[in-house]
Structure formats: C-alpha cells, structure tokens
C-alpha cells in the first residue's frame, strides 16, 4: 500500500501543502530545521493519531493555529483506495475519519496504514526499557495475527481488575483465583502469538542483518515474562503476597522482553552507534517482510536522517534493502547527493526540497532515477 496523496495543514512550521508522493522512494532534503522531519511526523499522525516527537500535541500544532489536520489517500493492494483524515486541536480532541466515516479507535488507522519509523531515537529499541521492545513485538503480531487485538484487550482488562483487587480488595482466595484464571488464559494466548511471531521473525532478521552488517555472535531471544517451565497461574499463586505488597502483578506478558546480545553482553553495550542503527533497521525491515508475507499489504517506511551514523558502504546497503521491499519509503537528509546511487534506474524516485517549511516537489514519481 502507499500514499498517493497527502495534505497537511497546521503541523509545526510546515506551510499548508498537498503532495503526490512516489509509490516507492521519496527523498526530502534541506537544511536542519527546515521541516523535513515535520512531514514524517504528519504521516505518523495520519497513521497513528499521535506524534513520535512529542507526547503532547500542542507543540505539533502550528503557532496561533487552532488545530493540525492531515488527509491521505491510501492505495490498497486490491486496487481499491481509502481516504484517511486525522485532526487534533489544542484541547487534545482527536477526530479520525476513514472513507468519510468517524472512527473512534486509532487501531483502525494503524491497520489501514502500517508505518515503520527509523529515526535517531531508534537506538532506544536496543538500550531503552523493555516496554519499547514489547511495543515493537506487539506491532508485528498485530499486523500478522488478526486474533491478537481481542486477546490483548482481554489481557488488559484482566490485569486492571487483578491490580485493582491487589491494591484495594479484601485478600481472599476466591477473588484471586477468578482474576488469576482470566489473566492466565489471556496471557497464554498472547504468549503463543508472540512466540510464533518471533519464530518467523528470527530467520528473516538474521538474513537481513547479514546484508547490512558483518557481525558475528548477535542473538535474538524472547522472554515471555514468567518462568518458561511453570504455568502462569502457579506463578501468580506463589507470588500473591509479594504482588499484594507491590500493588500490581509482577509476572505475565506485561513483563515480556526481547533480548539482543552479542555473546553474554547486551548489544547496546558493545555495538557502535552505526552498528546499533543497522541492527534496528534490520529488525524493522524484517517486520516489513512479515507483513507482506501475511498478505496484509506493505508497510510505509519513515526514515529520518538516513545518512547519519553510516558510511557510504552501509548507506548504500540500507538503500538497497529498502528498495527491495517494493514499498513506499519517505527519507529525510540534508544533502540528497549522498543517496543518489542508492536506487536502481527503474525505481520511481521523487525529490522534495524543504526550506523554511515550504515543500517543493522537484521530481515526480517516474521510472527514472532522480
């Protein structure tokens, strides 16, 4: 799938603009602070109804404007298209429309417009908290396993109920048994989906990484959040008093993690910044392959400042892998010439110059390298 039309109003320093991107490679270049990343942010807002740069939405809205609005026309694999629209005002109210109909859940946006973000904060996937790696994992499961969302909602409800009882309820075995059983059932289902996903992801990730980086000894493993040799219901029973003292459930899928190591060391501790970036890129690209294999369409990749941390050889390798995905890619850089050799002659490339918030399309999506 791809965005064939994109309209942006009221996003940071960007002037109101309507673009017709290439279905494949789109390069946005210009000085730092010109607004390149803001366009990626607008696409992210369209796909997830939130920014990747700020938890608060007020900084995203152009100064003295009441709201920011993004519209997009999405071309689907079945030759149909869908119209998406997202608007957020300064009070925090969000309006989502799909094909003219109001929608409540941002999950419907995510399902229609699967986005992969690679930006300077991507290092956090390796060095940050387990929550970030769970989000990465669950994004992938969500897009390949249609039953995941229902199980996830049951898990969250059971967790809320048990945690509330731990903090405020009377300590009795009947209540604990009820909440623990519901939590265990949902947890086993979530764990099964995650485990199957990791089994599919690992070989694709390893193959992708080899194309980017000569790195021996890197391993990817999955920790489910409780003892692999014990049923969760037994773990919950044995840790009841401790959970009660802490006021929350300490074992379960909400404590899961992906572990990337080189030998016995965490990858983030021993890899250079450039190596870390390539590992994260390999993970994101592998996810895109799995989405495509699941017949769920293709991801759209948002790559902010692709050249940073990478030498010419690794920039070229990354461009080639993104090109081989046959998906739509939006890339920002300061100097577009460093990416000119990254694409095949027949790959449609569109070039956009960004200056002081003004976006000018220099080359339309043709079959000739820009």
Curated annotation (Swiss-Prot):
GO BP terms: DNA replication; DNA synthesis involved in DNA repair; double-strand break repair; SOS response
PROSITE patterns per record: RECF_1, RECF_2
UniProt cross-references to InterPro entries, sorted A to Z: DNA-binding_RecF, DNA-binding_RecF_CS, P-loop_NTPase, RecF/RecN/SMC_N, RecF_2
Primary location group: cytoplasm
Subcellular location: Cytoplasm
Sites where the protein binds ATP: 30-37
Pfam families, per the entry: SMC_N (PF02463)
Disulfide bond residue pairs: none
GO molecular function annotation: ATP binding; single-stranded DNA binding
Record's keyword terms, sorted: ATP-binding, Cytoplasm, DNA damage, DNA repair, DNA replication, DNA-binding, Nucleotide-binding, SOS response
Similarity field: Belongs to the RecF family.
Chain's role: The RecF protein is involved in DNA metabolism; it is required for DNA replication and normal SOS inducibility. RecF binds preferentially to single-stranded, linear DNA. It also seems to bind ATP.
The protein's name: DNA replication and repair protein RecF
Source species: Stutzerimonas stutzeri (strain A1501) (Pseudomonas stutzeri)
């Amino acid at each position: 799938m791809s965005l064939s039309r994109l309209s942006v109003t009221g996003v940071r320093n960007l002037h109101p603009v309507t673009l017709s991107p290439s279905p494949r490679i789109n390069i946005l270049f210009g000085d730092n602070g010109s607004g390149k990343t803001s366009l990626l942010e607008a696409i992210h807002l369209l796909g997830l109804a939130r920014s990747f740069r700020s938890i608060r939405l007020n900084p995203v809205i152009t100064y003295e404007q009441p709201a920011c609005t993004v519209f997009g026309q999405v071309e689907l694999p079945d030759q149909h298209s869908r119209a998406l629209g997202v608007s957020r005002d300064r009070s925090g109210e969000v309006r989502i429309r799909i094909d003219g109909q109001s929608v409540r859940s941002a999950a419907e946006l995510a399902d229609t417009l699967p986005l992969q973000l690679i930006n300077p904060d991507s290092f956090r996937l390796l060095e940050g908290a387990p929550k970030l790696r769970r989000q990465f994992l669950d994004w992938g499961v969500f897009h390949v396993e249609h039953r995941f969302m229902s199980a996830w909602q049951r898990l969250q409800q059971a967790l809320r109920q048990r945690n509330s009882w731990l903090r405020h309820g009377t300590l009795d075995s009947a209540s604990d048994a009820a909440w623990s059983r519901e939590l265990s059932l949902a947890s086993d289902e979530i764990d099964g989906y995650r485990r199957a996903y990791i089994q599919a992801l690992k070989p694709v990730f390893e193959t992708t990484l080899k194309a980017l980086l000569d790195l021996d000894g890197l391993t990817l493993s999955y920790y489910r959040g409780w003892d692999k040799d014990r049923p969760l219901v037994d773990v919950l029973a044995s840790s009841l008093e401790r959970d009660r003292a802490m006021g929350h459930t300490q074992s379960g899928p909400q404590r899961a993690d992906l572990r990337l190591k080189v030998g016995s060391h965490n990858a983030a501790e021993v890899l250079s910044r450039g190596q870390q970036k390539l590992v994260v890129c390999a993970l994101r690209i592998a996810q895109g392959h799995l989405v495509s294999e699941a017949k769920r369409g293709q991801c759209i990749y948002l790559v902010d400042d692709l050249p940073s941390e990478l030498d010419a050889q690794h920039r070229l390798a990354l461009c080639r892998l993104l090109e081989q995905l046959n998906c739509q890619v939006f890339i920002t850089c300061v100097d577009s010439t460093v990416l000119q050799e990254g694409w095949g002659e027949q790959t449609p490339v569109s070039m956009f110059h960004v200056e002081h918030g003004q976006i000018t399309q220099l080359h339309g999506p043709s079959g000739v390298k820009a």
